[in-house]
Every structure is written in C-alpha cells, then in structure tokens.
Amino acid sequence: EHDFVVALDKEGVNLDTEKLKLNFENWIASSKDVSFVIGGPDGLSKELIKESNFCWSLSQLTFPHAVVPILVLEQIYRVWSMTQNHPYHR
C-alpha cells in the first residue's frame, strides 16, 4: 500500500476548512499514510506534481518557505480535531 501524496503548489486546489476536512477523511480512508510534499523557493517539479495524488494550494499569497510547514501542520491538526469533535477548530 502506497502513501497518499499531497503536493503543495500555488496552482493547486484551494480548499476551505470544511472541504479540507472532507478531503482529509478520504485521504486517510484510502491509504495507510498521507505525505505532504512542500517545495523549496522554486516550488516542486512538474513531474512530482503530476505524480502526486492531489495538489493543494494553501493560498494565492506568497509565504516564506519556513512558514509553510507550520501552516500545513496547523491545518492538519484543525481538520483532525474536527473529525474528533474537538472544539479547537472554533
């Protein structure tokens, strides 16, 4: 069983929190592990994006590279807390 690979790219799909939660639940259900791939200052290669299972855009804004992992982790925790009926997401 392979990881479900989510590539982060500015051209990816924009998701609100509820849609991210629904996608997250599907990703977890479809695979043992979910991997998030974050590119460097020049982004990810087109080949890697094409081979990923999903391409997600955090925003059309430009963020410092070091901030993106923090944003991704916070959003993962937020949607996970929603799946557990935890009040963090409010």
Model-based region annotation:
Residues 28-37, 57-65:
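Short, acidic/small-residue loops that bind anionic groups at enzyme active sites
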Residues 46-90:
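Structured adenosyl-cofactor binding patch, chiefly the S-adenosyl-L-methionine
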